[in-house]
Amino acid sequence: MAKVIGIDLGTTNSCVAVMDGKNAKVIENSEGARTTPSVVAFTDGGERLVGQPAKRQAVTNPEGTIFAVKRLIGRRFDDPMVEKDKALVPYKIVKGDNGDAWVEEAGKKYSPSQISAMILQKMKETAESYLGEKVEQAVITVPAYFNDAQRQATKDAGKIAGLEVLRIINEPTAAALAYGLDKKDGKTIAVYDLGGGTFDISVLEIGDGVFEVKSTNGDTFLGGEDFDMRLVGYFADEFKKEQGIDLKNDKLALQRLKEAAEKAKIELSSSQQTEINLPFITADQSGPKHLTMKLTRAKFESLVDDLVKRTVEPCKAALKDAGLKAGEIDEVVLVGGMTRMPKIQEVVQSFFGKDPHKGVNPDEVVAMGAAIQGGVLQGDVKDVLLLDVTPLSLGIETLGGVFTRLIERNTTIPTKKSQVFSTADDNQNAVTIRVFQGEREMANDNKLLGQFDLVGIPPAPRGVPQIEVTFDIDANGIVNVSAKDKGTGKEHQIRIQASGGLSDADIEKMVKDAEEHAAEDKKRREGVEARNQAEALIHSTEKSLTEYGDKVSTEEKEQIETAISDLKSVLDSTDTEEVKAKMQKLAEVSMKLGQAMYEASQAATPNTETDTKSDDVVDADFEEINDKKK
């Protein structure tokens, strides 16, 4: 039975795990690392890089390196958060054909789902390499506070990557699964998850295989990226004060500052001070300029103080919704790389009144939980019941633009809820159902998920027709809505296609594109392997020709030299078949040389035997002397 993998598709890093017996195992990638940077790069040579190779070349290719695309997934181009992001990243964020935020590289547009699919493909290949078999099914994690559009876009990314997404699972819930799988006693825990781009807080009751989410809250635009950018701004401002040069307009310099910020942030988790040293960061008429400064932990903490405090309000809201006080939480589990920051741990300790639990790896625990959920769905993990919730209220717009909730936030999913509405005008023969998600009282202040029309309502005075609207949220947190005219029995049902979102045709096209890219990548890899083999063959043949060239005729020697020259001339060719053909030709004409080498080694064999015999005689003498000594 094929394995189901668990993927933590992170803003900064991604991780893949699989069930190995009764335990979840994190799989190392081809570079030997347990997490993979969520970075995709397009080089000038038309090559596509994913993960560490992409991150490594970011400084020299800032506009072609796409990172933190998870912050754009499922968002409209005119979203205020997208506006904010545009000012912070060196790559181009553009308006997609559907009005969503997309990215553009070398004139080609990509949806965030497509970029995410490239990262998921890398995770899929990592798992396939380890398991030695094809992987087709996965459980993928998302921030608990992701809305329907963001969840749907993540599911689309899985489809584009060639994966059947069995379940979309919330990151804190996945972490709780990994933490509590072996816990028998009942506990109330809080999962505080501060990652690269998002923040979640979930309150759960766990015990004896039951994981029940009581409430969840968060901020989908708060994470390590914001801490990094705060440092980038500080470095640039300090440099401007000192040198009078603004680095914020220099994309190459900004990318170097970002790398330095990430490194400084990590170092300050374990030391009180770090040094930033960036030689040749820029230049003016007077010559090259270098950026050198010291940064203390205290200064860093003061720069990001408001970001740290932003995590407290969602914690308060989650506790309130769960009907609990901070003191009633038995354990606080820290998830996400940012929770290694001492200030974060201090705030958590202060708010909950207890030291956080540090027994799980914050970078890996989410992927492990996803793998466990995969095991549950496959039937390999028994006696586990997971009860998750919808993070935001769902409803429709009613008369006067009011948001009428049908499903309240923190309702256990899957769930279904119906309510009867009527017409606002006499003889109204159609109604438009506009579906929103959020917590504001007016519909337009919330996130519009989509809309549809119910037509053919028989003429009647206002308030007489009965229209039943049904919301259905599946276990992935994805919404289906139907509206039915109870008088005629006419029904209209939709899976909420986000007001932007990808159509089935878009997804199909992107799947084909991804498959073509996979074929291209395979072709490119075969080309590299063929060139490596060709260079090795040239090297060994030239060496043999130097040593044994006098053992073949002049004509044969010339044929070999010509074949070597021909093969060298096609080493830079993109035609792999041509390289293979020239290799075959060189191998054929070199056969006589191989024969000469073999004959030469055969001729040397008798001498070797004589040497061996004389060695044996010495050994015998040596042993005999020892016997006499005894």
Swiss-Prot record:
Induction: By stress conditions e.g. heat shock. GO terms for molecular function: ATP binding; ATP-dependent protein folding chaperone; unfolded protein binding. The keyword DNA repair does not apply. Residues 515-529, 540-553 have a biased composition (Basic and acidic residues). Residues 515-553, 600-630 are annotated as: Disordered. The modification Phosphothreonine is found at residue 198. InterPro entries: ATPase_NBD (IPR043129), Chaperone_DnaK (IPR012725), Heat_shock_70_CS (IPR018181), HSP70_C_sf (IPR029048), HSP70_peptide-bd_sf (IPR029047), Hsp_70_fam (IPR013126). The keyword Chaperone applies. Keywords: ATP-binding, Chaperone, Nucleotide-binding, Phosphoprotein, Stress response. Acts as a chaperone. NCBIfam families: PRK00290.1 (NF001413), PRK05183.1 (NF003520), prok_dnaK (TIGR02350). Belongs to the heat shock protein 70 family. This is Chaperone protein DnaK. The gene is dnaK.
